[in-house]
Amino acid sequence: MKSYRKELVFNVPVRRAFINITGQLEDALEESGVKEGLLLCNAMHITASVFINDNESGLHQDYDRWLEKLAPHEPVSAYLHNRTGEDNGDAHLKRQIMGREVVIAITKGRLDFGPWEQVFYGEFDGRRPKRVLVKIIGE
């Protein structure tokens, strides 16, 4: 069985963003040489997310508005976590809602997606470098 590991690095210049990383995962799969197996992709930071959904800008705006209603950034004093001197209590909650990782089947050397599925990196406390792990195992 083959095993392949790669890190992607994102330095998002704004607080919140969704970035389509499907192409980068397809590149990693090609580099790995794996034809049948699994690809795990996870955010390595507790204020970022990796998730699967449709690449439609209205949906991304809906996510952003919905998450901001569930866990608004302001007032920062509303979060006990922020008593530590941080101002990102909301980002931790947003990450928890959107999830940490995805696992995608690899079939015949391709990511085995449904019709509209693509993979996204969700940033909820940007403005500094963050890593995403790609781990591929298989034959």
Predicted regions: what they are:
Residues 1-139:
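Active-site histidine-anchored catalytic micro-motif
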